[in-house]
Amino acid sequence: MSPRPRLAVIPALLLVAVTAIWGWTFVVVKDAVVAFPVAAFLAYRFALAVALWTPFLRHLRWRSVLAGSWIGVFMGLAFIVQTVGLHVTLASDTGLITGLFVVLVPAIEWVVFRVRVPRATLIGVGLALLGLLLLVGALPRQLALGDLLVALSAFGFAVQIILVARFSRHHDPVSLTVGQTVSALAIFILAAATPMGGGFPVPSASVLVAIAITASLATALGLFVQVWAQRQLAATTSAIVLLTEPAWAMFFGVWLSGNPFPPIRIAGAALLFATPVFVTLAALRARRPKPAKAEEPEDADFAVAAS
C-alpha cells in the first residue's frame, strides 16, 4: 500500500481532535456566557485570536489573507444568523437543523462544481444524520422563522467548509486562517454595535476566562488545524467529522458535569463517533492500489526462437 492513504488518517485525526475541543469548550464556557451578549463575546473572542496571530504578520501572504476573508464572511454570518434563530426556536431544533450542513456540502459541491461523492461517503452522511437525530431526540414539530434562519446558517457553514477545502490546497494555511478570523471579527463587531446586539459590556472574570479559552484553543488553533487538515480531506468527509461536535459536547457534559442522558441519545452520539471512522476506512480502502496481475510466462518455443 502506498504511504499516501496512511498519511490521510493524520488530518482526519487532527480534525477529530479540534471538533472535540469545540465540544469541550461549549461545556466549559456555556455557564459563563449565558447572560453575556453573544455578538460581544464572539467579537472579544475573535479579536484575541487575531492578536495571537500578530507574531506571524510579517510572514503573511496577502493574497491568501484575502481568500480567507471570503471564508470568514460566510462563517461570521452563519454564527450571527444561528444566534438570532436560536432565540426564536427550540435548542433541539437548532442542533438538528444546523447539522444539515452535512447534507448541504455534497449537494452544493455537486450542483456548483460537479463533484461526485463516493457511495460510502453518502452512506456516512445518512448515518451521521441518523446519529444526530437520535442525539437531539426529536424532529422539528413545525417550521417557523427561527428554523428557517438556522437552516440559512447551516448553508453558511456548508459554504465555509467547501471554501476551506478548495482554498486550503492553494494558499498558505496561516494566512488563510488569519483572513477568515479578521473578516468574521468585523461581522461580529457590526452585529454587537446594532441596537439588538447588546453593545460591548465589560466582561466579568469568568467571561474573560471563557474568552481566553475559546480564542486560543477553539479559534486560533482550531481554525488553523481545520484549514491544514482539509487540505487533504474531501469537504464531505470533513463535514461528517465536524458533525460530531454535539456528540463531543454531550460526552464532556456527562464527564465534567454529570449531566444525565437517556440511552437513545448515547446511541446517537456513538453513531456520530463511528461514522467518521467508517468513512475514513472506506476512503483508505478505495485508495489502496490493486495488486498487479502476474505476468504470463513467455511461450517456450517463442523464447527459443528469439534467442
What residue spans do the PLM features occupy?
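Specific transmembrane alpha-helical segments of multi-pass solute transporters/efflux pumps
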Residues: 21, 25-26, 53-98, 106, ...
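Juxtamembrane helix-entry segments on the extracytoplasmic side of multipass membrane proteins
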Residues: 6-12, 34-39, 43, 60-66, ...
